[in-house]
UniProtKB/Swiss-Prot annotation:
This is V-set domain containing T-cell activation inhibitor 1. The lineage of its organism: Eukaryota, Metazoa, Chordata, Craniata, Vertebrata. Induction: Down-regulated upon activation of B-cells. The keyword Iron does not apply. Glycans are attached at residue 216. Residues 35-144, 153-241 form the Ig-like V-type domain. GO terms for cellular component: external side of plasma membrane. Negatively regulates T-cell-mediated immune response by inhibiting T-cell activation, proliferation, cytokine production and development of cytotoxicity. When expressed on the cell surface of tumor macrophages, plays an important role, together with regulatory T-cells (Treg), in the suppression of tumor-associated antigen-specific T-cell immunity. Involved in promoting epithelial cell transformation. It comes from Mus musculus (Mouse). GO terms for biological process: adaptive immune response; negative regulation of apoptotic process; negative regulation of T cell activation; negative regulation of T cell proliferation; positive regulation of interleukin-2 production; positive regulation of T cell proliferation; response to protozoan. Disruption phenotype: Mice mount mildy augmented T-helper 1 responses and display slightly lowered parasitic burdens upon Leishmania major infection. Belongs to the immunoglobulin superfamily. BTN/MOG family. A lipid is attached at residue 257 (GPI-anchor amidated glycine). N-glycosylated. The gene is Vtcn1.
Amino acid sequence: MASLGQIIFWSIINIIIILAGAIALIIGFGISGKHFITVTTFTSAGNIGEDGTLSCTFEPDIKLNGIVIQWLKEGIKGLVHEFKEGKDDLSQQHEMFRGRTAVFADQVVVGNASLRLKNVQLTDAGTYTCYIRTSKGKGNANLEYKTGAFSMPEINVDYNASSESLRCEAPRWFPQPTVAWASQVDQGANFSEVSNTSFELNSENVTMKVVSVLYNVTINNTYSCMIENDIAKATGDIKVTDSEVKRRSQLQLLNSGPSPCVFSSAFVAGWALLSLSCCLMLR
């Protein structure tokens, strides 16, 4: 039979073991709670020569001075951009991004780590990482950024042609797109034999102007000019009647995600109505 001293001794040992386990669990939960935070990237294509956005969000943290945002690009030594202690730190920025990047500093505390990229270049395409560290923990997410050129087409009646024809023009595309015509009346018809498409290189020797002419068109019919490459798809519609001409155009960025990014414009009887609805696509 164990003595009173032995009972007390083993009781103390058991209490120590239980307390140690509890402390380990508390520390473990504390570390895990601070170690990982959710970082989400959104992706869309960059239009060469224009400004673009690499979108990234994270769990908000009101402690601005404790937030670190780093943008990195695969294959590039140094950083694309860094924001810490409430301001930009560009001491390690790669030279190809100098003077071209900025974060939305006033939105960092609400979880916006998106990067504004000025004057998008063809070489900006690639895999980027959005790395975040806050007082709550750290996390990162990747996104694929495509670059090219895309623009909305405009369709007009070509009164200079020998027969009724339509002229579809789009000022900037890259890579070279495909062009196809469609008709509401003649659905499924192949218009390749009654259309002519040309590509004219622009002055910067990268993007190209797209011109396509459709011949032998009929009145009271709606025609569509569709321009598409691996980045974007644009459609221009036109309906010519005896009394008026109605036009509509739409540009859709082709990226994986639940919501497409769509720009659209409608022109009815000479009056223009412009609407823009752009939804960033969740990667």
